């Protein structure tokens, strides 16, 4: 193993991660691999694997999804050429599926899923997690997406789940603004899938919602350029209903 390869693994293993140091170590290893006359094929293959995998994970931490998209595709090519070094393939594939969901690239999501054996789609946690999330999104069971964050196979999934939740909340909020004259802060917290009142209050302030005591008051425009997304309203209201039913049971 080259010194640059060892250094990359050591820097990556440190907590909390120094992203600048990791990027520097990646660049150093890239230079070594570009002139790898001193490395045998096995050493070069292992170094390339760690280079690609850590580049993928670093891109997630930096929210650099263009770089992520580039490296994750290189990763798939690598695993095809070096299956003996593919112990992290399921993690990488799962992260790719999560990215495609978060980017709303559903056709690409299903194309990638078709390449994965059916058994792995249900039995492997890295793969089954994005599969379940996609089903929940299609069903409008957004509360299940929230619950998924509490039981994920890798912390790197969290960023993609939060991107999806941000998108869901924006859609629900837009529908609320066009469909409700008055909504209690408590009901808004449930409908927007927040854990507590403070999160709801911050979100309301960002949307410039008018809070009158314990309720939000909206001005509904008579003429709307776009029709209300009734399905989003239905799902949000359904979420509120189920939450109230659960409170009664408890």
Curated annotation (Swiss-Prot):
Gene3D superfamilies: 1.25.40.990. Acts as a regulatory subunit of the 26S proteasome which is involved in the ATP-dependent degradation of ubiquitinated proteins. The keyword Ribonucleoprotein does not apply. InterPro entries: 26S_Psome_Rpn12 (IPR006746), CSN8_PSD8_EIF3K (IPR033464), PCI_dom (IPR000717). GO terms for biological process: proteasome-mediated ubiquitin-dependent protein catabolic process. Keywords: Proteasome. It comes from the Eukaryota. Belongs to the proteasome subunit S14 family. Disruption phenotype: RNAi-mediated knockdown results in sterility. Residues 63-233 form the PCI domain. One of its GO terms (cellular component) is proteasome regulatory particle. This is 26S proteasome non-ATPase regulatory subunit 8. The gene is rpn-12. The keyword Lipid metabolism does not apply.
